């Protein structure tokens, strides 16, 4: 389940996913923060894999290919600086090609 949260100049994408589910590898043009609010995940950044347990906050640098796999049921937030408030447009703006 995805929930979008917006404030002045900020966007938070809340993802709730079950054990075994994954967020596909992707890359952003800008650095951002990700917050693991609940659960345990394996985070892939480039060639590195790190197991993280909530609560945790990690930085994802611009240009780094990354993905997440849930090792337990999880709540994960990606926090981005943007003025865009249309959920149908934020991924197009924030995810690099």
Sequence positions of predicted segments:
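Double-stranded beta-helix
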Residues: 8-10, 71-97
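A generic "binding-loop/recognition-motif" signal
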Residues: 29-30, 48, 64, 72
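Structural motif
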Residues: 40, 65, 73-75
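Short acidic-glycine-tyrosine-enriched beta hairpin
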Residues: 46-65
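A cytosolic small-molecule/anion-sensing beta-strand core signal
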Residues: 37-38, 54, 72
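Conserved short histidine dyad/triad with adjacent acidic residue
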Residues: 11-28
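Glycine- and acidic-residue-biased ligand/ion/polar-headgroup-sensing regions
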Residues: 29-46
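Transition segment at domain starts
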Residues: 1-4
């Amino acid at each position: 389940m995805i929930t979008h949260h917006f404030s002045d100049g900020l966007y938070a994408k809340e993802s709730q996913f079950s054990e075994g589910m994954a967020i596909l590898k992707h890359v952003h043009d800008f650095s951002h923060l990700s917050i693991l609010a609940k659960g345990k995940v394996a985070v892939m950044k480039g060639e590195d894999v790190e197991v993280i347990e909530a609560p945790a906050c990690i930085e994802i640098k611009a240009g780094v290919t990354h993905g997440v796999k849930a090792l337990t049921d999880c709540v994960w937030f990606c926090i981005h600086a943007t003025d865009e408030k249309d959920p149908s447009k934020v991924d197009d703006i924030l995810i690099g090609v």
